[in-house]
A protein has these predicted regions:
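C-terminal catalytic domains of large/alpha subunits in multi-subunit enzymes
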Residues: 1-96
Length: 96
């Protein structure tokens, strides 16, 4: 879940006018760190997968896939404007 939240709110590649990467290392690439995460409330909905043994589904990918879209959708509803890009930085939200 932390990875999905980090993808949604801060991770991005930035390039200069020559096309060179301005965020080439972890010092300049903005990852979420321990203590910067919100408290999560998690609920699971069981929907078996018909095409797999015992109806199992992948577990670890759900937070990565759903959280950026869910956060963008919630902020879009709150601001009353369509959000079509990530990351959802404070600067980007201010410009809405």
């Amino acid at each position: 879940m932390a990875m999905g939240m980090s993808m949604a709110s801060r991770e991005a590649f930035f390039y200069d006018e020559k096309g060179l990467l301005k965020t080439p290392n972890l010092r300049t690439y903005k990852l979420m760190h321990i203590g910067q995460e919100p408290d999560y409330r998690v609920g699971f909905v069981e929907t078996p997968e018909d095409g797999s043994p015992y109806g199992v589904r992948p577990y670890s990918e759900h937070g990565i896939i759903g959280i950026p879209a869910a956060l963008a959708n919630a902020l879009s509803a709150a601001f009353g404007k369509e959000i079509t890009s990530l990351p959802l930085t404070p600067e980007m939200l201010w410009r809405l």
